[in-house]
Design a protein with these regions (language model features):
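Conserved catalytic-core motifs of GNAT/GCN5-like acyltransferases
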Residues: 108-110, 128-145
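A short beta-loop-alpha structural element at the N-terminal edge
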Residues: 1-16
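Conserved acetyl-CoA-binding loop-helix of GNAT-fold acetyltransferases
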Residues: 84-101, 119-124
Length: 161
């Protein structure tokens, strides 16, 4: 498995995933994002990477600096046949390890409260729940959604690579 920087040539695949309600439902977009390739390219100039396995794009991950030494991350394993195989845990281990090696001291993320599969993965990597946000935002269907905030310090990181 490899994680590589996002290139404009990958926008078609990323757009397809982001417009797929089955892929995006966990993030509050059950009908997808309704975005174009051009919008994807414009919105994602920094911090977006794609996950490949056996020369096949299977997902994406991203990070951005939110404060001095703090990176916020996200991940999606978009191909359903690649889910529940430890691919996300391995990809996160690669990304988090790289972030810690490059000077970040804390990693933060959030996930939907109902996404217990992701919560299990995050906690297995050493993430600690910081806060639960009940009915804190509305999805595209107008339904209130809840989320969980997590953080990880380097000393607590459990790598799976």
């Amino acid at each position: 498995m490899t994680i590589t920087d996002f290139f404009d040539s990958l926008a078609k695949q990323l757009t397809a995933w982001w417009n797929d309600g089955a892929v995006m439902a966990h993030a509050g977009f059950p009908n997808g994002l309704g975005t174009t390739e051009e919008e994807v390219i414009q919105a994602l100039e920094n911090g977006l990477m794609v996950i490949e396995e056996s020369n096949r794009l299977i997902g994406e991950c991203n990070y951005c600096s939110t404060a001095d030494g703090v990176a916020k991350i996200g991940i999606k394993i978009c191909e359903s046949d690649c889910q529940n195989r430890g691919v996300g845990r391995k990809a996160l281990s690669m990304l988090i390890g790289w972030l810690f090696q490059n000077g970040y001291s804390k990693i933060v993320l959030d996930t939907d409260l109902t996404n217990t599969r992701a919560q299990h993965v995050y906690e297995s990597l050493g993430f600690r729940k910081v806060q639960t946000n009940i009915d804190s935002w509305k999805d595209r269907l107008g339904q209130l959604q809840s989320s969980v905030d997590y953080e990880l310090l380097e000393k607590d990181f459990i790598s799976y690579i």
